[in-house]
């Protein structure tokens, strides 16, 4: 009986974790460039009471085994890197990656993090930065008193000054790609960190070597589907209730034994 309660408890723990993942997805439904997470489960070790094909008589073998499971556990949470819808903002510093790739963001410790959030701002020195002040890499500095800023699909940044004289190219934004984007580690602030599972970043010009193109004046919305998450929430709630009822049923069986034995 104790084993049954323990198995049901693992089910409660697993569904609680899944509910946390779903809640985080829904909380970030309006977060620019956010990628939804999903929880993956696996069954735990089995108690092998009889091996399949084992001897059950003088001349007979068991066609099946007798193996009792010991529950379930969450084995991973994984980001789903599907394209979010593009929202037009008409802000010259807003960028969206249409396709595969991430913006490169410099961290205070000198490392590079990666993001799909292209809502950039100008720092006091004219550099392109995130909402938290982290520098976009390669660094782009916009001179003062520009009349317009143009960012091409290939990442080329050019400006026109109020004095005229034609477009002046300032540099080119490059994006990074990974062989296994699901292996990136989320670190908050819309940032992801390279890991051994993700593989090394492959930096290239937008639109080249499989990299996505840039779209100026637009942002990528979260790829969270609210209806899908609500369905997942109901499924999780029902699974949690079923495991809770299993514990109650085992408790009733134990109570019956105590009262009648």
Regions found by a protein language model. Give the residues of each.
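Amphipathic alpha-helical polymerization modules
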Residues: 1-261
